[in-house]
């Protein structure tokens, strides 16, 4: 048994990719996308028919040029999601424009629009996760959407405060990042020799997982943003792990036995009063790494979103 199959005994494996061929090869349960992956996928030959359909849709909808570009971008993300769903039995995560991360109302409106676009193609909302940045506004938008039956995946999650606020809001799933936390600490003080169990990213996810299970929150914990196979194996047993195709291939080729590292707690603790907005902002602000990486992540996704829109604009 290879490590990928071994990992699947304890954890739901999710493909962090927009490449359909890779997704088919590794047979994950779910798939996650983001503006960076959509931008990369848009250049693949296999997606050209979807790209053309996107442009035709935007032209048909009409409106100003800016409106057409936004409609094309939303439609392309959904078209790729629909195609991915042909190859996974579970769900696909589609991301809300990162530039809306500080506008609760716009996050809700965009999420509803994406769900409607999926439904136009016969995809029920039970197969979709709407990805939102884990800002206070994103978390509150998700709380509202969950009440409408629209499940959300809160991403760019780096601090314990973000995770706790998401759990308290009843968010379906959170994606605490491992690799980007590792990057931040490693750049300041190289983690040498490397010990996976001491990796700050691994430690962060373990703490979040244990807290949510001990306090009986229903939020699914999905570790994300991995740099090394060792990080993945150190979190075997986490509810879900979303993994790049490069690391899926490494796991597929290795046959070392996989041991379960995380298990739900048998203890139960009383849930504390939910964090208020000032408490959330203060607790998050106390984590310099999380402040840096959340801001950077939003900026990076915004740049890739703009690049995608520029690509579409050139064809419209």
UniProtKB/Swiss-Prot annotation:
InterPro entries given in the database record: Aldolase_TIM (IPR013785), TAL/FSA (IPR001585), Transaldolase_1 (IPR004730), Transaldolase_AS (IPR018225)
Compartment(s): Cytoplasm
Cellular component aspect of the GO annotation: cytosol
EC number of the protein: 2.2.1.2
Regions that span the bilayer: none
Pathway(s) this gene product operates in, as recorded in its UniProt entry: Carbohydrate degradation; pentose phosphate pathway; D-glyceraldehyde 3-phosphate and beta-D-fructose 6-phosphate from D-ribose 5-phosphate and D-xylulose 5-phosphate (non-oxidative stage): step 2/3
Active site per the UniProt annotation: 131 (schiff-base intermediate with substrate)
Residues spanning the signal sequence: none
Keyword list, A-Z: Cytoplasm, Pentose shunt, Schiff base, Transferase
Record GO biological process: carbohydrate metabolic process; pentose-phosphate shunt
Key word Transferase present: yes
Entry similarity comment: Belongs to the transaldolase family. Type 1 subfamily.
HAMAP family: Transaldolase_1
Complex formation: Homodimer.
Protein name (database record): Transaldolase
Higher taxonomy: Bacteria, Pseudomonadati, Pseudomonadota, Gammaproteobacteria, Enterobacterales
Gene (UniProt): tal
